[in-house]
Amino acid sequence: MQEKHTFFRPLDSEELPFPKSQAPALISGMVQSLPDCWQQTSALALLPSLSVACGGVTYGKNAKPLAFQIAVYGLAGSGKTQFTCRPAQVVQSILSARDDLARAEVKGQVQDCPKVMGFEISTVMLAKYLQHAGNQTVMLYTDEISSAVGSDKGGNAFMQLHSILRKGYDGTAHTMDYKEKDSFRGCISPRLSFLACGTPHAVFNYFNNKAVEEGSTRRVIFVEHPYHEQHVEELAYSIESKEALENELYYLQSQSGNLDLDAVEKAVLQWKEQKAAACGDDRVAKLMINTPADIFRRATYLAYVLNHYEQLGNAIFFGRWVAEYALRCAMNLTYSTQKEIEKIDEKIFSTSSAEYHSHFNEQMLASLPETFSFQDVVNYRKAHTEYSGDKCSPSIISRWKDRGKIKQIQKAIKNVQPALYQKIAN
């Protein structure tokens, strides 16, 4: 059971160092001048932008998008935007510039979806754009989620994006109503990544307990940007390195198709079984492995494309590293909330399931006297359940009679005598 405790181990670069040698060269090259602690965080922050660059590639039996949803949190002024998110910003700027160039060439008449959009976008405008995204993954970005979301009481009317973010992660259909000249119902199947930054309070104010319960938070990798005391020079990329990056992104944008490799699936299942075995009887912990296992697949296939469909072993190593971070992140940040939700759900399940009712009815029969009346059954149910009326009591008595557990020894005569029943000894 020792392995179980590793689920809650720290996320820092000493515990879970960035795999420089196994990571795709594009990622390693963009983060190599940063301190180790920020190489780890900036590599993770790059995933959404690179998923957009590989936006035509899908994976698995259901052709899911290589979407990643990352929320970076750290102290105000600690360098989240300047360091952890800087490589991602460079990729985003190239993708956006290419978008602008394409529009300029057709004099702005193309109704396509921008590759990178701000978190401040309204749900209506986002839906309109996503209708034109085709089979491409796009992303939302904000370097300060508190200004994008709005007030502390849940965000403004334009930022109720949880449902679209959740659907966009898996590329499943999302239906919404909005009104222009006439009423219109739009159905979209978004492929949506995002990168958001903020202080811990701002990030977890948006991805709150409600978001945990509805599933939005489960898909997010929360990346902790650590405080670094030593001075670090601002990230700068040479003209040559930017040109090489532009060429690489151009290649990635030309890629399409669906990836589904047995070697990847075998590695993911082996990792998943290992983690599940360490959970014992903890059902919540076992369920929380599922999304990191899916992230394992996504990160592996993304790395495989970045490696030009070579070095599959390194791609699997990198995917496992991302999955390990995602799992530890989930266990440290949302496990306790999930456990509380399970307690509530357990109570609902246990009082609505056939198994519960069967067990309860057996206890009731054992507690009743050897000879009892219909009213005795009603009184017992009132004392031990949230009683909702007498309609269930006749059915319970009928089942007991049919199964040979009781017999009727006196018929009811209205306003004269009650029906009486007697237990039958087994």
PLM features: what roles do these ranges have?
Residues 1-426:
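Phosphate-handling catalytic cores of nucleic-acid transaction enzymes
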